[in-house]
Curated annotation (Swiss-Prot):
Snake venom phospholipase A2 (PLA2) that inhibits neuromuscular transmission by blocking acetylcholine release from the nerve termini. PLA2 catalyzes the calcium-dependent hydrolysis of the 2-acyl groups in 3-sn-phosphoglycerides. InterPro entries: PLipase_A2, PLipase_A2_Asp_AS, PLipase_A2_dom, PLipase_A2_dom_sf, PLipase_A2_His_AS. Disulfide bonds join 38-98, 54-145, 56-72, 71-126, 78-119, 87-112, 105-117. GO terms for cellular component: extracellular region. Residues 20-27 form a propeptide. This is Basic phospholipase A2 73. The lineage of its organism: Eukaryota, Metazoa, Chordata, Craniata, Vertebrata. It comes from Hydrophis hardwickii (Hardwick's spine-bellied seasnake). Residues 1-19 form the signal peptide. It is an enzyme of class 3 (hydrolase).
Length: 146
């Protein structure tokens, strides 16, 4: 799925929640994007990571194409561990702050929220310390992710 499609889908979901008079819940995907932006000091859009390599974005398979893609695999595995603990990582929100050294979890006491916050902060910091290779954006996963 293209990043623009994800934004449209997100906008439709938020609109439907508003139309149903249900207060919109902050979505973890949106929060994770803010954590990423904090970690890289606004140098790269979080959307750049939505379709990178074999693991950044929806799904994931094969061998990561580089260290940045490996960050996404580790993040996927971390969410998998959270799910095994009975958590719903894509739905949970948490308190975090953006300090001079990047994002950090702030006053997160609930087990699941803490786990998800730790997963997201670790991934965002991993993204920030590894090089982004434009050649690994929007790759043919059927050919390169075996």
């Amino acid at each position: 799925m293209y990043p623009a499609h994800l934004l449209v889908l997100l906008a439709v979901c938020v609109s439907l929640l508003g139309a149903a008079s249900i207060p919109p819940l902050p979505l973890n995907l949106v929060q994770f994007s803010y954590v990423i932006t904090c970690a890289n000091h606004n140098r790269r859009s979080s959307l750049d990571y939505a379709d990178y390599g074999c693991y950044c974005g929806a799904g994931g398979s094969g061998t990561p194409v580089d260290e940045l893609d490996r960050c996404c695999k580790i993040h996927d595995d971390c969410y998998g561990e959270a799910e095994k603990q009975g958590c719903y990582p894509k739905m949970l929100i948490y308190d975090y702050d953006c300090g001079s050294n990047g994002p950090y979890c702030k006053n997160v006491t609930k087990k699941c929220n803490r786990k998800v916050c730790d997963c997201d902060v670790a991934a965002a910091k991993c993204f920030a310390r590894n090089a982004y290779n434009n050649a690994n954006y929007n790759i043919d996963t059927k050919k390169r992710c075996k």
